[in-house]
Amino acid sequence: MDKKQLLRNLPKIDELLKEEIVNRYLQENSRTLVVDSLRQSIDHYRGEILKNNIDSFTKENVVNYFIDTLEENKSTKFKKVINATGVVIHTNLGRSLLAKEAIENVVKISENYSNLEYDLKEGKRGSRYSHVEELIKKVTGAEAAMVVNNNAAAVMLALNTLCEEREAIVSRGQLVEIGGSFRVPDVMKFSRAHLVEVGTTNRTHLYDYENNINENTGVLLKVHTSNFKIMGFTEEVSSEEMVQLGGKYKLPVMEDIGSGTLVDFSKYGFTYEPTVQSSLEKGVDVVTFSGDKMLGGPQAGIIVGKKKYIDKMKKNQLTRALRIDKMTLAALEGTLKCYIDEKEAIENIPTLNMILSSKDIHKKRAQRLKRRLQNNVKDFNFKVSEDLSMVGGGSMPGERIPTYVVKVNSDKITAEKIEEKLRLSKNPIIVRVSKDEVILDVRTLFERDFNIIVEEFKKLLK
C-alpha cells in the first residue's frame, strides 16, 4: 500500500472513541486524557508512515498503542529506578538515598503544619535555620551554621557576603568544574566577587597568594578538588598556612570542600578526604559543602564557620532566593541526628553503609541473586565475579571499592539489548555493560530489588 493511502487510512479520533475498549477507558479516565492519548497514537503511526517504517497497520494496532500511551501518561514521569551500576552516589539517579529517620521526618513535616518559621517557646516568628543549626554545630564543632538549597548556592552566597566587588584569591589548580558545565569561576562571577588566579595548574605556593594580596582583597579561597586528582610534580598550600596568611592580613579564609564528609574514611582503609571538622579545627573561617553526597542526606548547601560571617550571610538578600524548603530541612535534620553517633550513622545512612560494607557480605548477596535468576530465568548465563564499585557524585576520585557482581549474557539477545529493555521496563533497572555482558553490582541493590530483577529478566525474551 502506498504512503498516501496509508495516511488516508489513519482513523479519526471520533471514530476511535466509538470503539468499545476505548469507551471503557473513557469511563475510567478524563476525556482530555483519553483524547490526548488517542491523538498521540495516531501521530505515532503518521510519523512511522512518513518515515517509511511501516507498510501496513490495523485499527487494533492504533488502539493498542493508545492503551500503552494512556498508561504512560497516567504514570508519573519521576520514577523509582533500581541502581545496579555499583555507583553509590549516582548523580543521574538522585545521588544519596535517605536514611529511614530522614524519610520519617519528611513525612511527618510534609503532611502536617509545622513550626517552620515559628518560635513555639516565644509565640512569635522564628528562623527556619534554627531547626538544624544546633545539630550542625554539634556534629561539626562550628561556631555557627546555615543551610541553602545546594553547594553552588552556598559558595555564591558566601563569596557575595565576604567579597562583593572585591577580589577572591584562588589557586589556578582549584578552578574546578562541578558537573553540568557549572564551574567555580562562573559561580564566582555571579557572586560579584572578582577572581584572582594564582600559581599554576600543578603547583601553587604560599607566596603566590601573598604576592597578590592588596587593599581590594576580600577573601582567600581554597577549593577541594573532590572530583579529580593531580598526580606527580605538585604543590598546594595547606589550610593551616592559608589561615596564618589570612590572620596576618586580617582576611577571612574560605574553603569549599564539596562532597563534605563528616566521617574520616581513612580509618576504614580509604584514601584520606578532608572532613568538615578538620577544616574547622585548622581555623578556616567559612566552610561550604553538599548535603547529598558523602553526608548522605538531601540536596543542600551547608555553610559552617565563624559566627560573625554566618550572621552576615543570614542577612544577605540572596539568602531568601536560595533558602531551603521545609521538606529538605526535615530530611537534613533526620540525617544529622544519625551523626551524633558515628557507628549509628554508618549503620543507618544508606550512602555510608553501601560504601563501607564489606566485600564478603556482597559475595553472599551476589550468590543469592544468581541462584534466584538461575532458578527462574531460562536462556541466560549467570555467574558471580569480583569487580569494583565506585563512590560517585564527584567524590573520592580514583577510589574503587572491591565488590561482587552477577554477570549476565545470552545467545539469544545482546547485552546492549538487555540493558535497553531493563532500562525501559515497567520497573527501570540501570545496569553496566562490559564485553557483551550485563553487570549487576549488588553493592547498590537492596534485597527488595532481587524479586523485581528476576521478574523483569523473565520478560526479556517475550
Swiss-Prot record:
Domain of life: Bacteria
Catalytic activity: L-seryl-tRNA(Sec) + selenophosphate + H(+) = L-selenocysteinyl-tRNA(Sec) + phosphate
GO CC field: cytoplasm
Enzyme Commission number(s) of this protein: 2.9.1.1
Cofactor(s) needed: pyridoxal 5'-phosphate
Pathway recorded for this protein: Aminoacyl-tRNA biosynthesis; selenocysteinyl-tRNA(Sec) biosynthesis; selenocysteinyl-tRNA(Sec) from L-seryl-tRNA(Sec) (bacterial route): step 1/1
Subcellular location: Cytoplasm
Modification sites for N6-(pyridoxal phosphate)lysine: K293
Primary location: cytoplasm
GO MF annotation list: L-seryl-tRNA(Sec) selenium transferase activity
Coiled coil location: none
Alphabetized InterPro entries for the sequence: PyrdxlP-dep_Trfase, PyrdxlP-dep_Trfase_major, SelA-like, SelA_trans, SelA_trans_N_dom
GO BP: conversion of seryl-tRNAsec to selenocys-tRNAsec; selenocysteine incorporation
Alphabetic keyword roster: Cytoplasm, Protein biosynthesis, Pyridoxal phosphate, Selenium, Transferase
Pfam families, per database record: Se-cys_synth_N (PF12390), SelA (PF03841)
Protein family membership: Belongs to the SelA family.
Protein function: Converts seryl-tRNA(Sec) to selenocysteinyl-tRNA(Sec) required for selenoprotein biosynthesis.
Protein name as catalogued: L-seryl-tRNA(Sec) selenium transferase
Encoding gene per record: selA
